Amino acid sequence: MHLSPDTMNMVDDGCLSTESYHDLGKGGVSGISGRVHSIDVILGFSKDQDPLLEPSGRHKVDEDQLEEQEKQVNADPYSHLQIPDQTQQQQSVYHDTGLFSTDKCDADLGDPRSNVESDSRSPDIPDEDQPKKKHRRNRTTFTTYQLHELERAFEKSHYPDVYSREELAMKVNLPEVRVQVWFQNRRAKWRRQEKMDTGTMKLHDSPIRSFNRPPMAPNVGPMSNSLPLDPWLSSPLSSATPMHSIPGFMGPGQSLQPTYTAHPGFLNTSPGMMQNIQPMPPPPYQCQPVFNDKYPLEDVDRSSSIAALRMKAKEHIQSMDKTWQPM
């Protein structure tokens, strides 16, 4: 856009003056307060020249309101800040109405536990719905006299009736219920003691303990001569001659050596040779040591085995006697 020299001359000299420049530097609002420089003025149009450019109606009212607001801002630039007196007055009003009271806040924050308890207790629960606490009975401490009388009554009867319990309660100065409870506990203790006693008796009578045999005497041995001979050993040969006179008899100190050997040609020998051969006695019977055992089954087995051995020994002796007879 190009401006003619005539239009440039029509621009007000006050716009380019130093005073207006300083006013614009100090503040945008204060610099505008003196004179409003519109676009029409800058362009050089005056209000009288063109009536179409003249503001009318609503625009004119808005410009007037803006001018008034700018004047008020220039008159009191710190009007948006409150005066201390006014703030104090407002605070006093708040305190009077109770909206800005610190006492209420302190009271609410002072005991939060009470608030919680009040909230928890707010729903009213009837007494029937609340769980009842279990009544715990105190333990009774009996004196020596009371225990003595109760033990005497327990020895007479483990299950006393109501009348005897009441009489005993009056005697020992105790309630009848306590006496009844004492008898119940005493019977339970007695049953436990009986079970323990029966268990120990079974343990003592168990067959495992029967194997603990006493030690054998030193004079008892398999080759001991102090043992008496059984009557079944008394054969005609042994009764007629003593044991030491029998050839082939060995003393306790001699070593066991074979004294009789069987030969296939022994039966085919002549009678003259048979006279020179002396008959050999049977080997001495070794007596087994006797044990005192409590277990009955072992006694039965041992007696049966001994009887069988005796029968075999008798048969052997009879057969040997037949062979010793002269042919």
Swiss-Prot record:
Q: Motif range for Octapeptide motif?
A: 37-44
Stretches the record annotates as Disordered: 48-73, 100-139
Task: Report motif location: Nuclear localization signal.
Answer: 310-314
Q: In which tissues is it expressed?
A: Expressed in the outer nuclear layer, in cone photoreceptor.
GO cellular component terms, alphabetically, are: nucleus
Question: Which is a GO BP term held by this UniProt record?
Answer: positive regulation of transcription by RNA polymerase II
**Superkingdom of the organism of origin:** Eukaryota
What is the stated purpose of this protein?
Plays a critical role in eye formation by regulating the initial specification of retinal cells and/or their subsequent proliferation.
Q: What is this protein called?
A: Retinal homeobox protein Rx2
Species source reads: Danio rerio
